[in-house]
């Protein structure tokens, strides 16, 4: 969620998605960044600052799941799982 008060306080249990991926053999090796409260159009938080587009440092990587998008953009993993709050781009593309 990007809250600085949660820094260094990991959850004691895995989420359902994490559990399913782990059972399927996934290896978690990195964390990606999110904007504070997730509902912002740009990925900026007080822990690591601004996450930029990996192909053009002058552009944003987007908000909500921007860190995940940046990771997928540099082929840093074989799967990216992001959140979806308003589906605005989805509605426009239909």
PLM feature spans:
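Structural signature of FAD isoalloxazine-binding scaffolds in flavoprotein oxidoreductases
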Residues: 87, 91-94
């Amino acid at each position: 969620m990007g809250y600085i008060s949660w820094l260094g306080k990991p959850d004691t249990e895995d989420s359902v998605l994490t559990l399913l991926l782990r059972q399927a053999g996934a290896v978690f090796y990195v964390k990606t960044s999110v904007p504070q409260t997730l509902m912002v159009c740009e990925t900026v938080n007080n822990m690591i600052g601004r996450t930029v587009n990996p192909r053009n440092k002058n552009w944003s990587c987007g908000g909500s799941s921007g860190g995940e998008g940046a990771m997928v953009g540099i082929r840093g993993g074989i799967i990216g799982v992001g959140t979806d709050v308003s589906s605005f781009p989805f509605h426009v593309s239909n």
